């Protein structure tokens, strides 16, 4: 296992220094995949992984589902892929392959939901230093078994919850297909739709908030058979919340 993890660190990182960083934060051996947090502070270690995630996003959102406009570069990125974005990259432990990713964005600045006024139905969308936006969840095609909640998707959700609980983030905003609402509800995320669902590019979408709680983490782990922490934070010293908490609303 240690040898495999050393190989993975070399494959996705930049050398021996990163191998040491990887080994200090290894998930437990029973975890079939590990989820790495990537911020502006440590993204130099994950350039290949991030590039793969942008291409995976393009394949899923633009090529397979026509949910976002196709980009000639073969990469799906937007103005929110900036220094304050937080990425979660899921790698298979046995193959070192990127199998999924998701992105968190702070809500104290302009955020994607502002661009989807029709989907929000005119309701206020919460904004606060302790509220983040959950977006761009994607899983490789051959790991989408067990819909609607496959193992990689569950692993990413658990990793996001682990991170948010550590960082005192207590609420997430997101757009989700209506078909996903029951799984969030069943797993203790307490989804609260902000408006009635709307059809966007042929898919019934709802804007909602979900709570970050230990209960949600426990129930999601139980559903997916995850028995350990999956999150790996390497060379990150800065907190996610850098502003004094206070309630805000979209203007």
Go through the PLM ranges and name each one.
Residues 1-34:
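Short acidic N-proximal helix/loop "leader" segments that mark the beginning
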Residues 25-79, 94, 98:
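Short amphipathic alpha-helix that is part of the acyltransferase structural core
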Residues 77-82, 198-202:
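A short beta-turn/loop motif at secondary-structure boundaries
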Residues 78-89, 109-112:
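A short helix-loop-beta-strand connector motif used in the catalytic cores of GNAT acetyltransferases and
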Residues 90-93, 210:
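Active-site beta-strand termini and strand-to-loop segments that position acidic
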Residues 92-125:
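Short, His- and charge-rich active-site/binding loops that engage polyanionic ligands
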Residues 112, 117-210, 214:
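Acyl-donor binding region in acyl/amide transferases
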Residues 136, 203-251:
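Charge-rich, low-complexity intrinsically disordered segments
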């Amino acid at each position: 296992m240690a040898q495999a993890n050393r190989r993975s660190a070399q494959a996705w990182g930049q050398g021996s220094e990163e191998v040491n960083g990887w080994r200090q934060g290894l998930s437990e051996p029973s975890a079939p995949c590990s989820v790495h947090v990537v911020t502006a502070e440590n993204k130099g270690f994950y350039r290949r992984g991030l590039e793969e995630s942008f291409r995976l996003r393009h394949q899923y959102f633009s090529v397979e589902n026509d949910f976002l406009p196709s980009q000639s570069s073969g990469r799906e990125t937007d103005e929110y892929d900036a220094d304050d974005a937080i990425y979660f990259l899921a790698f298979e432990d046995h193959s070192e392959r990127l199998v999924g990713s998701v992105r968190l964005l702070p809500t104290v600045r302009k955020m994607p939901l502002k661009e989807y006024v029709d989907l929000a139905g005119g309701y206020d969308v919460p904004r606060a230093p302790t509220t983040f936006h959950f977006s761009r969840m994607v899983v490789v095609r051959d790991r989408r078994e067990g819909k609607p909640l496959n193992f990689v998707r569950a692993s990413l959700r658990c990793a996001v919850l682990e991170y948010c609980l550590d960082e005192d983030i207590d609420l997430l905003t997101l757009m989700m297909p209506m078909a996903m609402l029951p799984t969030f509800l069943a797993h203790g995320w307490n989804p609260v739709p902000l408006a009635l669902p709307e059809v966007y590019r042929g898919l019934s979408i709802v804007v909602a908030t979900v709570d970050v709680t230990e209960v949600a983490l426990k129930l999601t782990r139980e559903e997916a058979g995850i028995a350990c922490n999956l999150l790996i934070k390497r060379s990150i010293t800065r907190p996610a919340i850098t502003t004094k908490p206070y309630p805000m609303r979209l203007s």
